[in-house]
């Protein structure tokens, strides 16, 4: 019997004395023919490579007990038919049950000694190929005795042993030797054939080609091999040999016939596909694979594989008889530790799945178990899955792998073969690893994974599913603020820019403390009434930088001639000279794009101007905040949605009229103001400015985008010229700004413009025309007559716009510290979003009101018709229809026109409406929940029955403060704080504050008596402190250090109590420290108490101002009870100097100074004692870790040496007298 050595070109032969096996298949030997004869050396003949013929035929003489499907049996049949064994070597049989590596090694060593003559002769044939040799060493001693039943029994045992070791011996690159061969190599008992095999790898390509041909022939001839006899070793055909060769990755210990001595000779040979020693064998390049041939044969392969699985062929791997015999594919057997130490296990795991359906083909007619087992498509455990027909390519690749040298094709075979053998769970494990590699190589294709195997497909699918990452939930990140190399902000929300400019925070200060600025602005926004409303406004483009620079450039006249030239009646002839302002809002860009569609002359200015007017009005509103420019923006706010529809005609004439030589600064601020004013008052200078802007808009889409804010202002001004001047006060409506800030920033402006409602009304009146105009612009470009008439009216009052322009220009430099500042630049467009949102809301409300009015008119018409019908008694139906038609006619055009007019902003308007509606519903639901909770906390009675003689002594932001007598004790005077829940900004805090006060009974905390919920008003009954607040004393008298110490001591006592209960007041200031006539001090206002003192109007208007807040609160950091200690320190400065630090600064700038300046500086520290300065420094430590707590401060010398409470009584009386005199 002859076996091919994979890398060794020299042939070796073994003769079986009991059988005459002939190698009729010289082609197996890479161009050499080996005939083993009785002599010690083999004959070597050079023959051309050719596929074997009739390799599947079996003879009747085949009586080997190996016919039960072992690969050895198949190979023996093949060689018996092909070539006669001329020689006979020692017949050595090995105990089949042992299967140990030691036994196989012993057998291998003996065989090596016997085949020395052949090996020595093989040395002379180094350049020759070698016939394929049987893979691995097999222990078949136990098979030489016993009858057929014994043979069957032995076979089953051997099968178990093979299955047991299948996972341990899975082949890998350079480790394809059987365990016996590996052991022999370890002991340096390597035959010359093996040495030559390691040295000569050049013949592998020829060998792989020949093996491939043999494989193909074997497949084709598979259906022809049929005799269902129990085959013997004599009848084993090349079919078996090819299967063993093809399953290079799954070489088995093959049991031989107990009476046959061939097994002993086979045990000393290695598979031709065996690369040799792992350390020395170099894998040759993979041979080329004929894909076409493989594909053409894939159908046959799949059929034969399926057939073999369908037959009753027993699988050697299905029982545990051969578990004792290790195979290369078995990685999980622990019987051969030396083999695992050979690095075979690591590589075998990667390649164990490559030997798949192999070359062995099942004869379709085979019925006998023995025959079918020999042709089972997979000869190794869990190596060959039954691959469906769609798996053709992988199957072919696998077969090619099997026929070619394992080392050369291992890269291709990785993960190709799926382990679908039902018995090999362990094998599947390694196979899945290989499949994972394959799928990763090919991009985890679903098709690839599915084709590799069902398991691999499921694995790959699961991997794909696991890779998916969910999107963020409830994400509210609206903008990322960064700082560029120049220290300017990038991505700063528009309203933030406006707030910074309005608050007087210079660009230099922003660059010095950029993070602090972002923190304080964020904090300021969080404390605004409706912080969520500002979310819509925070989206803008990075081109705001350019726009901001452009806005800053507005202070200078436009460089492009378009500004001066633009100003024609149509307003569309200007050149795109001033595109430096890019609209910050994406909405604006959309509008501009839509506007671009409009004709450049009329339609573009109108549409773009309407949309740009929206944008510009925001910019202008920013300026107006600094200046009286707000009226225009307010008009636009109310009109914003309708103006988007189509105020083209009004904007076009007005813009042309208003277009003027106005400088960019005047343009930017006055754009809204001047444009609105121009349209409302249309002074020539203002008109010139707005027309230039309008021309720029019409010049080009880009210029329009840049100028959209300008144009929008102009258009809107033209649309509703009359209301613009009064509309200035409407700016506070923008929820992004606090009422106090807006009022402080533009007190004069408020005076000049206080009628945003009329502007909106005018706008609403024009809304109907605007949609029509817009439609006409797209189609006929005809300007509606009503808008033109409206524009002329605005020009009549030119003086106000001129004043506004002058005021704006003068104020612009002040509030915008540097025209070049990016912040200032961005500031101008900042208002766009706010204005847009407010305009959306106002416009929607106006539209609803208009619809309601229309419905009322329709109703009146119907009633009138009905009355007429009653009088006539006939034609009622006609009258009804007429009334219905008349009614329908007016409303239909209005809604229809509105959508077209808002083609650019209609979608935005709808979205804003939906958002507003959702917010209203959410707010309503939340309010209901809060009210329900309050009902459970509050007393259900009527406070009017318990407390009488109510006298109002103060007014807070959400209600009044009253004094009353308790009916049960006339001498007991109580303070009642009445709050309208609808006006309370943070209703949810009321519940917590009531609960805190109920559980806080302390001499230094105002006692909470009761609370009532009456008709939507919350009544909080508290102890009355007749002395008033500490603010009265601070403002009307000068306090000594001893008196200041008393106030601090009593306040610290109350704070210590609150802090011990885990309550942080967070609003310690003089307004919340109350005194009685005896000088006793108590803390009040736990979040819902209104300010009683109306003397200092600034304090009242600055609800929620952070002058007493600790830096950690302003910087939005974590804070604890020590924030109250900082506030106490600020209150000490208030008692010393009469007001807290930064009181004259805007709230936002005060926040900035608190966050950046650290401990505030005293005006005259030298006049103070060491104790108070030390105490004050301890209270005002910026690092709260170094700041003292209430208990520590109570032990300070300044507190222990202070005056008595009675020392405050004179101050309280003086304050009351002065207050009474002031009231008189």
Swiss-Prot record:
Compartmental location: Cytoplasm; Nucleus
Entry keywords, A to Z: ATP-binding, Cytoplasm, Kinase, Nucleotide-binding, Nucleus, Serine/threonine-protein kinase, Transferase
Source organism superkingdom: Eukaryota
Pfam families linked to this entry: PBD, Pkinase
Regions of compositional bias (Pro residues) in chain numbering: 783-801
Binding site for ATP: 953-961, 977
Catalytic activity: L-seryl-[protein] + ATP = O-phospho-L-seryl-[protein] + ADP + H(+); L-threonyl-[protein] + ATP = O-phospho-L-threonyl-[protein] + ADP + H(+)
Domain Protein kinase: 947-1199
Skewed-composition ranges (Gly residues): 564-575
Residue numbers spanned by region Disordered: 1-378, 403-464, 539-825, 861-913
Family: Belongs to the protein kinase superfamily. STE Ser/Thr protein kinase family. STE20 subfamily.
The protein's name: Serine/threonine-protein kinase CST20
The organism's taxonomic lineage, starting at the top: Eukaryota, Fungi, Dikarya, Ascomycota, Saccharomycotina
């Amino acid at each position: 019997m002859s076996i091919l050595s994979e890398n060794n070109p020299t042939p070796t032969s073994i003769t079986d004395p009991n059988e005459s096996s002939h190698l009729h298949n010289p082609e197996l030997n890479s161009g050499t023919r080996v005939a083993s004869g009785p002599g010690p050396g083999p004959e070597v003949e050079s023959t051309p490579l050719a596929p074997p013929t009739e390799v599947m035929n079996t003879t009747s003489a085949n009586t080997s007990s190996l016919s039960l499907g072992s690969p050895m049996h198949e190979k023996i049949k093949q060689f018996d038919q092909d070539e006669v064994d001329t020689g006979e070597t020692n017949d050595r049989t090995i105990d089949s049950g042992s299967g140990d590596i030691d036994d196989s090694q012993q057998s291998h060593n003996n065989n090596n000694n016997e085949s020395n003559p052949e090996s020595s002769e093989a040395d002379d044939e180094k350049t020759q190929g070698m016939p394929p040799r049987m893979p691995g060493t097999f222990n078949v001693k136990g098979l030489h005795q016993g009858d057929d039943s014994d043979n069957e029994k032995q076979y089953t045992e051997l099968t178990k042993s093979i299955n047991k070791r299948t996972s341990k011996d899975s082949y890998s690159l350079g480790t394809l030797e059987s365990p016996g061969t590996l052991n022999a190599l370890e002991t340096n008992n390597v035959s010359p054939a093996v040495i030559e095999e390691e040295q000569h790898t050049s013949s592998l390509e020829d060998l792989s080609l020949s093996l491939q041909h043999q494989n193909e022939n074997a497949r084709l001839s598979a259906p022809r091999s049929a005799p269902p006899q129990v085959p013997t070793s004599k009848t084993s055909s090349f079919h078996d040999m090819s299967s063993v060769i093809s399953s290079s990755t799954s070489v088995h210990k093959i049991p031989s016939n107990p009476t046959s001595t061939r097994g002993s000779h086979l045990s000393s040979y290695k598979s031709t596909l065996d690369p040799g020693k792992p350390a020395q064998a170099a894998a040759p390049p993979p041979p080329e694979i004929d894909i076409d041939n493989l594909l053409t044969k894939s159908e046959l392969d799949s059929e034969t594989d399926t057939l073999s699985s369908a037959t009753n062929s027993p699988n050697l791997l299905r029982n545990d008889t051969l578990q004792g015999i290790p195979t290369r594919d078995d990685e999980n057997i622990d019987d051969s530790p030396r083999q695992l130490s050979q690095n075979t296990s690591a590589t075998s795991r990667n390649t164990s799945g490559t030997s798949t359906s192999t070359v062995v083909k099942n004869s379709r007619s085979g019925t006998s178990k023995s025959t079918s087992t020999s042709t089972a498509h997979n000869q190794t455990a869990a190596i060959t899955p039954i691959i469906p027909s769609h798996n053709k390519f992988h199957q072919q690749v696998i077969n090619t792998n099997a026929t070619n040298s394992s080392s050369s094709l291992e890269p291709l075979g990785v993960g190709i073969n799926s382990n679908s053998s039902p018995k090999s769970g362990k094998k599947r494990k390694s196979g899945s690893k290989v499949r994972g590699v394959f799928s990763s190589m090919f991009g985890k294709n679903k098709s690839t994974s599915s084709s590799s195997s069902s398991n691999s497909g499921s694995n790959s699918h699961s991997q794909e599913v696991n890779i998916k990452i969910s999107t963020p939930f409830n994400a509210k990140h609206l903008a990322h603020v960064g700082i560029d190399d120049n220290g300017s902000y990038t991505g700063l929300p528009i309203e933030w820019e406006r707030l910074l400019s309005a608050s007087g925070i210079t660009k230099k200060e922003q660059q010095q403390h950029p993070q602090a600025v972002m923190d304080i602005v964020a904090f300021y926004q969080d404390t605004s009434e409706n912080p969520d409303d500002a979310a819509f406004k925070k989206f803008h483009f990075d081109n705001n930088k350019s726009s901001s620079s452009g806005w800053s450039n507005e202070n200078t006249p436009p460089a492009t001639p378009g500004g001066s030239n633009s100003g024609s009646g149509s307003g569309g002839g200007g050149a795109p000279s001033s595109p430096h302002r890019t609209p910050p809002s994406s909405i604006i860009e959309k509008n501009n794009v839509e506007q671009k569609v409009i004709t450049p002359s009329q339609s573009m200015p109108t549409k773009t101007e309407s949309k740009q007017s929206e944008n510009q009005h925001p910019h202008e509103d920013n300026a107006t905040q600094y200046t009286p420019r707000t009226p225009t923006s307010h008009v636009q706010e109310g009109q914003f949605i309708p103006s988007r529809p189509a105020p083209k005609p009004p904007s076009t004439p007005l813009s042309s009229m208003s277009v003027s030589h106005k400088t960019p600064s005047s343009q930017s601020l006055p754009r809204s103001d001047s444009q609105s004013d121009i349209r409302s008052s249309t002074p020539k200078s203002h008109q010139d400015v707005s027309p230039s802007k309008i021309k720029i808009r019409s010049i080009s889409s880009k210029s329009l985008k840049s100028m959209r804010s300008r144009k929008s202002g102009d258009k809107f001004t033209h649309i509703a010229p009359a209301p613009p001047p009064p509309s200035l006060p409407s700016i506070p409506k923008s929820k992004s700004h606090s009422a106090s800030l807006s009022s402080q920033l533009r007190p004069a402006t408020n005076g000049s413009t206080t009628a945003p409602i009329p502007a909106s009304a005018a706008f609403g009146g024009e809304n109907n025309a605007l949609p029509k105009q817009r439609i006409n612009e797209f189609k006929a470009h005809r300007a509606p007559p009503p808008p033109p008439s409206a524009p002329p009216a605005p020009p009549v009052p030119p003086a106000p716009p001129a004043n506004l322009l002058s005021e704006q220009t003068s104020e612009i430099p002040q509030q915008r510290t540097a025209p070049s500042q990016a912040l200032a630049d961005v500031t101008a467009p900042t208002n766009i979003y706010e204005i847009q949102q407010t305009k959306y809301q106002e416009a929607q409300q106006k539209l609803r009101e208009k619809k309601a009015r229309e419905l009322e008119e329709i109703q009146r018409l119907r009633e009138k018709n009905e009355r007429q019908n009653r009088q006539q008694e006939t034609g009622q139906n006609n009258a009804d229809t007429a009334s219905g038609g008349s009614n329908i006619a007016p409303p239909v055009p209005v809604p229809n026109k509105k959508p077209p007019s808002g083609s650019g902003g209609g979608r935005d308007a709808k979205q804003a409406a939906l958002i507003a509606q959702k917010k209203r519903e959410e707010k309503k639901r939340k309010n209901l929940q809060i009210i329900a909770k309050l009902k459970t906390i509050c007393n259900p009675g009527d406070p009017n029955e318990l407390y009488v003689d109510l006298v109002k002594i103060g007014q807070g932001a959400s209600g009044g403060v009253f004094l009353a007598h308790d009916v049960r004790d006339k001498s007991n005077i109580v303070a009642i704080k009445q709050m309208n829940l609808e006006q309370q900004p943070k209703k949810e805090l009321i519940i917590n504050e009531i609960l805190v006060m109920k559980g806080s009974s302390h001499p230094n905390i105002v006692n909470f008596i009761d609370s009532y919920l009456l008709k939507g008003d919350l009544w909080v009954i508290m102890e009355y402190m007749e002395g008033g607040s500490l603010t009265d004393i601070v403002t009307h008298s000068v306090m000594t250090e001893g008196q200041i110490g008393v106030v601090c001591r009593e306040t610290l006592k109350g704070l210590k109590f609150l802090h011990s209960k885990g309550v942080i007041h967070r609003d310690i200031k003089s307004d919340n420290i109350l005194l009685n006539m005896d000088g006793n001090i108590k803390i009040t206002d736990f979040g819902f108490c209104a300010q009683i003192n109306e003397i200092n109007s600034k304090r009242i208007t600055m609800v929620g101002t952070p002058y007493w807040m600790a830096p950690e609160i302003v910087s939005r950091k974590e804070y604890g009870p020590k924030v109250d200690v900082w506030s106490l320190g600020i209150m000490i400065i208030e008692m010393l100097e009469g007001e807290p630090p930064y009181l004259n600064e805007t709230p936002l700038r005060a926040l900035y100074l608190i966050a950046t300046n650290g401990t505030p500086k005293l005006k005259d520290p030298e006049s103070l004692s060491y104790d108070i300065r030390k105490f004050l420094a301890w209270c005002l430590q910026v690092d709260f870790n170094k700041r003292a707590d209430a208990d520590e401060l109570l032990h300070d010398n300044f507190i222990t040496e202070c005056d008595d409470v009675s020392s405050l009584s004179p101050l309280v009386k003086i304050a009351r007298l002065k207050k009474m005199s002031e009231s008189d």
